[in-house]
């Protein structure tokens, strides 16, 4: 996952790139050719050839993190016409029932050690609050926070999914991420 994208963040070593292409585009393809019912793509996201526009809408499989990591508005999805979207989403807190399995009432604070030990996204709590404040006032009671972040997450998924469904034939599928992530 995201192997080709990783190369854009590191020095381009032609030996490593050649080995990557040989393994993922040739050797693995050869090994699975007898399993014709199993679709195979060498990387996700994927353009039309190795290291080509793996975020372009017109080809392959895309990951779209402009909403969430890029703090774009939820309607950003409506400007995109991807062929297949295999990663997108928006984080929310788990239910209060789940929160009570890992935090005491005195730890009901996003900055507490109990919450920070579960937050795997750098700046994730700030991003959740950014999107929450786009729609709602910040809640006075912590117990309202999981519910409100869940509404924002649902709105994100709904907005994107409805757009992609309206474009069936152009967009042939989407997979959202961060829904029901493991918190306890």
Give residue ranges: language-model regions.
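Substrate-binding clefts and catalytic carboxylate motifs of secreted carbohydrate-active enzymes
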Residues: 30-33, 41-44, 48-59, 63-184
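Active-site mouth of glycoside hydrolases
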Residues: 1-39, 43-46, 174
